[in-house]
């Protein structure tokens, strides 16, 4: 299921059923620039809708950067759990480079009430650990024994500082576009196949593209008609049906909804 809305997320989310979403992954406006799209969404009503539509064991992952990170945490301190540090391949803030260090990371803040799905995305190819320990005590029942520790695994659990290849200025179609690889990483971490993901500020649709590739249902909301139309083109480029139906909701004149199965076009024929 692919459902796209063009309009105000606070209005549109009221039409989403209670406890129907497994994972909310979005890049809210930080309100740190003078751009028309960078306007802070009121956080209290936003959390009210998030909490209503999210399943009891659902998870919210929000992109942020200081000072917006602090605002987000303090807007819902009881549900905040931890942060991921996303290291950028290129720094930003060149105009202030002589006054302060350039910004080379953003945050993904994790919120939930009950322990959500967590599928750690292990990295592979590390050097195995084969440490031979002489006269170590494996257990008091057997006294001192010779043992091999480490098990030879080349896998490692994820750490909270990670890096993704960032879309360049030329390839990006949105000024704050985040890598599809990042969306795929967090979707695989916090959902299972067939789960429903919401992006309440989907921009050019990267989260939806990731959901299509991974077999997740997707609900996307974007207020800016320009980027909403770009997202439609990106979904079609992924091989989704070229006959996505357009539906007008009577209760929201400013909403356009598209629905389609998240299957490749050759599966639909």
Where are the regions a protein language model picked out?
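S-adenosyl-L-methionine
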Residues: 1-13, 233-267
